[in-house]
Amino acid sequence: MKQDMIVILDLGSTENTVLARQIRDLGVYSEIHPHDITVDELKALNNVKGVILNGGENRIVDGVAVEVNDEIYTCGYPVISVDYPGSKCEVQYAELPNDEVMKDFLFNVCKAEANWNMKNFVADQIELVRKQVGDKKVLLALSGGVDSSVVAALLVKAIGKQLTCVHVNHGLMRKNESENVVEVFGNQLNANLVYVDATDRFLGKLEGVADPEEKRKIIGGEFIRVFEEEARKLEGIEFLGQGTIYPDIIESGTKTAKCVKSHHNVGGLPEDLQFELVEPLAQLFKDEVRACGVELGLPAEMVYRQPFPGPGLGVRCLGAITRERLEALRESDAILREEFANYGLDKKVWQYFTVVPDFKAVGVRNHERSMGYMVVIRAVNTIDAMTASIERIDYDILEKICQRITDEVTSVSRVCYEITPKPVATIEFE
C-alpha cells in the first residue's frame, strides 16, 4: 500500500521533526525536503497530498532570508505555512498547529488517508526489498543494536537465507549481548549468522591507549577490517544492508541547518567491496524503528535496548582499557540495569549506564584497607539528545544498587552518582 504523504519544506525551523512526527502520529506519512525543491521534483514524489512551508529562526543563510520557489504556491497541492513571514499562502500559522487544526488540514483539506502504520510499512518494505534484491545475496553487519536488529529481522522476513548477518564481538559489549544476538537470530529466526569473537584482537590493539579519540579510531578501523575479512570469505554478495534511519538523513543537513553531520553507517570498506545499499528503515524515526521491531516479533529487550555508542564499553572504561576494569564495568552495568528494571525505572529513564575511571580509590574490605575501582552511575532524560537532564533517583534505590555492586563486584571500592546535566557535560564521558 502506498501511503499518502505530506511534504514539509525546511525554511529554517528547529521543529521540522516535531511537525513531521505530529503528522505521522495522526496516521499520515510525512517527509522533510529542502526549501528550494522544484515543482517537478515535488510531483515526482509518491502520493503527495499537501505541502507545509515551515519557517523559523534559521531562515537567514549567509545574510539572506531563504524563500521557496514561487511556483510552489500554484503547484496544485494544498499549501499552508508555519512561522514564515515571507509566505504567500492564504492560510498561515505563527506557530505549529494543534492536533485538531492539523487533522482538519490533513483529512478535510488534503483528503489524505490515515494509512501510515507499521503493519503497512513492513508489508511495503518486504515487497520493495524483494523487488530490489531479486535472487541476489545481502550482507549485514549485525551489532545487536536496535537499528541493525530490526533491519535483520525485516530482511530475514523478506529474503530469508539470501541474507548473511555478521556479528563481531569486539569484547566491548554489555553482559550477554552477543549471546542474545546468537540466540535470537541464529536459533529463533534461523538466519545465516556468522559470529566472530574478536575480543583478543580488539583488546590487544587497545592495550595502553588512553586517548578517547584514538580508542574510537582503533575500534572503528578494526571493526571494518574484521568485517572486510568476513565479507571476502563469502561469494555472490551484491548488496549491503544498513540500519540507516530518517534522523541520519535529516542530520546530513540542508542549507538552513546549523549543525551538519555527515551521514554514514558501515562506511570505510575498500573500493573492491562496494555494494548496492539496502536501507529499509530510512523512512523511520527511532521510536518508529522500535514499533517496527515489535511488529516483526523481536523480543522486548532487543527492541527497547538503550542507545549504545559504536565503540561500546570502550568509551565507558575511561582511559587505557584493562580486562579487569572492563569486567568491573560490565558487571556493574548489568546490576544497574537489573535494579532499574526491578523498580520500573527502565521505562522512565531515557539512558542509564555505569562508567569506570582509570584510577583506584581506597576502601575497606574484610576489615582491611583495600584499593578498588570507582563506579560512576549516569542516568539522564532527553527528548533529542541535544540537551539532557539528570534523573532524580530515590536514595534508597541508589543505596541498594551501591550495596549490590560493592558486594558482587569485589574489585570496586565505591559507587558515585553523577548529576551534571547537558550542557555543561555530554551524556557520555568520552
Segments the model singles out, each with a brief description of its role:
Residues M1-E238, G253-E430:
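RNA-binding accessory domains that recognize and position tRNA/RNA substrates
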Residues Q242-T244:
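Extended catalytic-interface subdomain
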